[in-house]
Amino acid sequence: MYGASGGRAKPERKSGAKEEAGPGGAGGGGSRVELLVFGYACKLFRDDERALAQEQGQHLIPWMGDHKILIDRYDGRGHLHDLSEYDAEYSTWNRDYQLSEEEARIEALCDEERYLALHTDLLEEEARQEEEYKRLSEALAEDGSYNAVGFTYGSDYYDPSEPTEEEEPSKQREKNEAENLEENEEPFVAPLGLSVPSDVELPPTAKMHAIIERTASFVCRQGAQFEIMLKAKQARNSQFDFLRFDHYLNPYYKFIQKAMKEGRYTVLAENKSDEKKKSGVSSDNEDDDDEEDGNYLHPSLFASKKCNRLEELMKPLKVVDPDHPLAALVRKAQADSSTPTPHNADGAPVQPSQVEYTADSTVAAMYYSYYMLPDGTYCLAPPPPGIDVTTYYSTLPAGVTVSNSPGVTTTAPPPPGTTPLPPPTTAETSSGATSTTTTTSALAPVAAIIPPPPDVQPVIDKLAEYVARNGLKFETSVRAKNDQRFEFLQPWHQYNAYYEFKKQFFLQKEGGDSMQAVSAPEEAPTDSAPEKPSDAGEDGAPEDAAEVGARAGSGGKKEASSSKTVPDGKLVKASFAPISFAIKAKENDLLPLEKNRVKLDDDSDDDEESKEGQESSSSAANTNPAVAPPCVVVEEKKPQLTQEELEAKQAKQKLEDRLAAAAREKLAQASKESKEKQLQAERKRKAALFLQTLKNPLPEAEAGKIEESPFSVEESSTTPCPLLTGGRPLPTLEVKPPDRPSSKSKDPPREEEKEKKKKKHKKRSRTRSRSPKYHSSSKSRSRSHSKAKHSLPSAYRTVRRSRSRSRSPRRRAHSPERRREERSVPTAYRVSRSPGASRKRTRSRSPHEKKKKRRSRSRTKSKARSQSVSPSKQAAPRPAAPAAHSAHSASVSPVESRGSSQERSRGVSQEKEAQISSAIVSSVQSKITQDLMAKVRAMLAASKNLQTSAS
């Protein structure tokens, strides 16, 4: 691939060396011819670019300028200037010779064989065909099972003390050969129902017909590929010559195969051999009694006699133990039945099935699940082709009668010593309302069910159970695969009726088991269900809000069939379906469902329970807010579930699983996020402490004030700031003359005491935040502290700035730190110089900041001095005030203008100092402010959106 032209030239040298070495070796060896072979090493170099170019066809050139035909330089067409003579479109045999329909079919089969490996795993197919071939070999064997190995006495275990007896085995062998010869030579007579065309030759013997019949049956089930494999395997076996197209029995084989596919033919070859075996049972028993001398074999070691399973399963049920619980259940149901004589679907009266009692209860239990249908009828095999139905069923054993209805029922006389049960009488229901009468033959007219052979039956039973558990989508997906093993899913298949019967049986069993499991929690009063959605995870009631969502998604038909809701809120019990006669399922079959329920309901964590309850209630509110969780009263007897109910129940189960899984994932994610947030909060708190140690204690005092009112901080961070819109004016700041100086300017010792108290309070809050009890509160405090620090609107920030710049020497010392703190706030939240921006900032005012304003008011010398702002800063709120009807539009007194000019001259020197001191902490603060800026921006945007939507 990567060797390019150098790699191609080497093999040519090698082959040339072989040719040259041949004569040289012959000349030196005399009469003995020697061959000397030598070659050169060829190194391959990986060249990805050239390989890619080769892959994309960049080395190809157009032939004779025609870009439709691209060739490489080694192509022989490069020597030709005209290709029409050699074009396949005109000279191929398929153009000149049109295929007939049969030839086209054979050609299609050949094409399928040619390209089989493209879409089929040949190894798996070969293994499957080997298995089917073994099954066919066993089916073609005539004696009992264990035919693969011949069982002989005396050959391997020679005892010299015993005399050798050659006469008896030889006689027995001759007798068996004579019997086989008689059977093999028995001429074949076509049955009456099999209308063979006149031009089709019949097989000469019954044995040949049996081989053809069984081969056709296997090919119908396994597909044409099995026939090809069988033809290759049995190429030398003359008994399978009918598989060849030119054999005289091939048309008969094709006819039988077509009849089987269309359902017009059932296997009949086994009946005669079974009758012979039955007739020979007595003689076999006599022979066994005679052979009790030397070679005695215990009966338990005998190979089992090969019997017809179809006939065995079709025997009518005539035995039921009177002490069996099912018999008592039948009597009780007939006595308590409120329906008159049941009628079939077409109106013909059906006699209630009564059975003859004997002591063999195991046989009854074994056969119950096979052919006792839910409507009380037995499934009998269809009559052979060409035989009248009435004459066929009239030959059934005594005690089995056939009604005129399509569903075949059987009745037997009551057991001796017992009186027949009286006909059921009508009775009113306890609720007083007339319940809908459910007839025993509620199902559609049931077609006669053909039980499958023992190798197919477990597959059908398993698939029916899986479909009952997983829903009809599973059945459609299996049918879409077109697997030969699951061909019974097709409605035309002979075992489809048996599959449908088993599927309905498992559906009823699944429905009944789940309804029993649901019945206990559903008995809770309906009033408590809507009031306590969070308790659904504790008591494990499936009738919670999650189920409402599932029912709303699947059509909501389940409540209508299981219970009828009266407008006043009471539930009327619906009538239940007839009892299905079947063996009770083992406890192990129900374990997977129980395990799932335990996993869903067994949540010991309170947080998880509340979270699941909230999720289930929210999902119910999203899917169908008007529907309240219904409480369905379930009868003790199992109702017959419809397809919609089963799909709704399965959807509910899947939804519960998904909800539980989502809750667990969310809990794990929340715990992980909470740990990360704790780490982030701890880092931010340490960074804030580091910044506060670098600053003066005045910001610490303010931080203490912020922590004094954590609830107001949380209010400002969680609730939207009330924006004043429209014509609502901002609360005016009254400018009063400096008649009352503040207490802080008169007595500075009191101010120091206050600061000490605040420091103590801050230390106490720090120690409290380290304890696990106050972990979450400290987290919210630290977050709100940082938010409140940086999310002050511009109107309040100007007020705070003006108050901090008083003329006292104490205040003067703190002003650079204040200015540095303000500089660390993002520029988007400082006082803007544009009127539009200032108008936006001056509108939002939180209650927490109003408290701060009141506290800072008490600290200033006078309220008039606190209003003095430098002209550069005062210029922004002044034009914005008329638009917002703010009180900042009050005229500035000469005292204020004088103070502002003095502060401006001071501010130039103080800003230089602040630039030097802020360089130390600017790198740390920039990271924190970037994180907080996004949060504050989102909070302000959300508050504005909420306020505008409310207005």
From Swiss-Prot:
Residues 9-21, 169-178, 592-601, 646-682, 736-755, 814-824, 901-914 have a biased composition (Basic and acidic residues). The keyword Transmembrane does not apply. It comes from the Eukaryota. Residues 284-294, 536-546 have a biased composition (Acidic residues). Residues 426-439, 615-633, 718-733, 865-900, 915-926 have a biased composition (Low complexity). Pfam families: DRY_EERY, Surp. The keyword Aminoacyl-tRNA synthetase does not apply. GO terms for cellular component: nucleus. The modification Phosphothreonine is found at residue 642. SURP motif repeats lie at residues 211-253, 459-499. One of its GO terms (molecular function) is RNA binding. GO terms for biological process: alternative mRNA splicing, via spliceosome; mRNA 5'-splice site recognition; negative regulation of mRNA splicing, via spliceosome. Residues 412-425 have a biased composition (Pro residues). Residues 756-790, 798-813, 838-864 have a biased composition (Basic residues). Residues 1-28, 155-185, 272-298, 332-354, 404-439, 512-569, 592-927 are annotated as: Disordered. The modification N6-acetyllysine is found at residue 315. It is found in: Nucleus. Keywords: Acetylation, mRNA processing, mRNA splicing, Nucleus, Phosphoprotein, Repeat, Repressor, RNA-binding, Transcription, Transcription regulation. The modification Phosphoserine is found at residues 283, 604, 832, 834, 905, 909. Plays a role as an alternative splicing regulator. Regulate its own expression at the level of RNA processing. Also regulates the splicing of fibronectin and CD45 genes. May act, at least in part, by interaction with other R/S-containing splicing factors. Represses the splicing of MAPT/Tau exon 10. This is Splicing factor, suppressor of white-apricot homolog. It comes from Homo sapiens. The lineage of its organism: Eukaryota, Metazoa, Chordata, Craniata, Vertebrata.
